[in-house]
Amino acid sequence: MSNSKEVKSFLWTQSLRRELSGYCSNIKIQVIKDAQALLHGLDFSEVANVQRLMRKEKRDDSDLKRLRDLNQAVNNLVELKSVQQKNVLRVGTLTSDDLLVLAADLDRLKAKVIRGERPLAAGVYMGNLTAQQLEQRRVLLQMVGMGGGFRAGNTLGDGIVRVWDVRNPELLNNQFGTMPSLTIACMCKQGQADLNDVIQSLSDLGLVYTAKYPNMSDLDKLSQTHPILGIIEPKKSAINISGYNFSLSAAVKAGACLIDGGNMLETIKVTKSNLEGILKAALKVKRSLGMFVSDTPGERNPYENLLYKLCLSGEGWPYIASRTSIVGRAWDNTTVDLSGDVQQNAKPDKGNSNRLAQAQGMPAGLTYSQTMELKDSMLQLDPNAKTWIDIEGRPEDPVEIAIYQPNNGQYIHFYREPTDIKQFKQDSKHSHGIDIQDLFSVQPGLTSAVIESLPKNMVLSCQGADDIRKLLDSQNRRDIKLIDVSMQKDDARKFEDKIWDEYKHLCRMHTGIVTQKKKRGGKEEVTPHCALLDCLMFEAAVIGSPQIPTPRPVLSRDLVFRTGPPRVVL
């Protein structure tokens, strides 16, 4: 957006804020309550999985089901949600001229949205070429002078469109909106930040939003005071955005809700009795400033955004509430009737769940009975079978270890609380994505006990042997031999998505956002590294197929996690 357009757009926003201030409310406490409910009740391993799915270049019905299921879980946990409601606008508060204007604007908005969802501009690919063909296509387009051409909001730099290939596209409706409570919860959990720090950082961003649209330059400056804002990413394609992405727009929306008395549009609450009054006030601003619905595909201007959200959401908070249960689009849920008197009521579904989980102090080390159980369990390993090993963390301070035998599917998988918290947090951001709080309940002493119990002179396969060797040597297991398969990174992880799709339920600890540096600068999100799933994908890479025997755990959950009642060790 050019500077002149941005200034004009913000002028519209400010004018709408002033005119609609009577419909705004202070919802900071409600947003924070919902964020706390999500922190305590949401499965963040599934959040991380959905974030991974949103990075795939093509997604199918199974991916959509995962997204919808997670959205429903979020909806069940929060109180701020919109309720399905059919709105029929009639002559009354709104004049017949008002209704004609609204009907025309809704029709234009419908055409714009649908056209934007199916771009036909040159250089945009919506088909099913392979990755190799797409790369060849990119080179050819550059050769003929199209490399720097059209880059709409739904294309990557190389012209690839990340597309949903689903049987029923209507199931995509209302599944991608951002929610402040969800943004806050994800920043806390996945950014491993204190809730108060996140609230303060977003509040400062919201204060900037009272005067201008914050941009990435503003964000960089704020990040110097609030490091957690560094988790926010540069602008993403609209087709790839979801409520679980750390976009600037999501953060700004969250910040707007934390400003008491800011008259932010994001805090408007719609009821059946005030909808027409809100629309009447919006039309007043439209006429005074000459606001309009643009024919140009792309982001909605403030008037378009307000109109769409008001007509879609029914009863609730059109900007910030969960709307995953809303069916249809704005033009489906709001109609204009100059003579009819149709009304439909919907009862709100009030649901709330608060599940708290916290680690409690327990005796350190394995008990005698646990040691005996471990030795018996280790007998399930075949000392002569092919065996993979992988670790996450540093060899002197590992946090996750996995041992896997593909012939019979047996695996050992456990975790360890780190001693170097600072290094752990760095590794979490750039490798494994584990939250330190999730490791407080793991069984201490298991690393040494398991390595000590491995069969003598055993041979282990690994992808990179240096760290594994250091770990084994530190436990005086120099008798164990290592085979470093030394695959290229891309080759080793070519079945990564298929393995995660099939076996993600085996490990729910990798909840954070993991980023790695690009060769040409900047950073990108990647799938977290899980020691167990890495072993599975390495085996799949070696045999050339993700079809592997069903993995079966050797260790019981009681061995991996402390489950007994707390007691004081004297």
Swiss-Prot record:
Quick check: keyword DNA damage in the entry?
no
Could you say which residues bind Mn(2+) here?
390, 392, 534
> Keyword annotations for this protein?
Capsid protein, Helical capsid protein, Host cytoplasm, Host-virus interaction, Hydrolase, Inhibition of host IKBKE by virus, Inhibition of host innate immune response by virus, Inhibition of host RLR pathway by virus, Interferon antiviral system evasion, Manganese, Metal-binding, Ribonucleoprotein, RNA-binding, Viral immunoevasion, Viral nucleoprotein, Virion, Zinc
Compartments in which it is found: Virion; Host cytoplasm
> InterPro entries, from UniProt?
Nucleocapsid_arenaviridae, Nucleocapsid_C_arenaviridae, Nucleocapsid_C_sf, Nucleocapsid_N_arenaviridae
* Binding site for the cap structure m7GTP, as annotated region: 54-241
Which parts of the sequence bind Zn(2+)?
A: 400, 507, 510, 530
**Hydrolase in keyword set:** yes
Q: What is its EC number?
A: 3.1.13.-
The disulfide bridges present are none
What information about domains appears in the record's comments? The N-terminal region is important for the cap-binding activity while the C-terminal region contains the 3'-5' exoribonuclease activity. A CCHE zinc binding site is present in the C-terminal region and may thus contribute to the substrate binding and/or the specificity of the exonuclease activity.
Q: Which family does it belong to?
A: Belongs to the arenaviridae nucleocapsid protein family.
Protein's job: Encapsidates the genome, protecting it from nucleases. The encapsidated genomic RNA is termed the nucleocapsid (NC). Serves as template for viral transcription and replication. The increased presence of protein N in host cell does not seem to trigger the switch from transcription to replication as observed in other negative strain RNA viruses.
Q: What is this protein called?
A: Nucleoprotein
- Record organism: Mopeia virus (MOPV)
Query: Which gene is transcribed and translated to give this protein?
Result: N
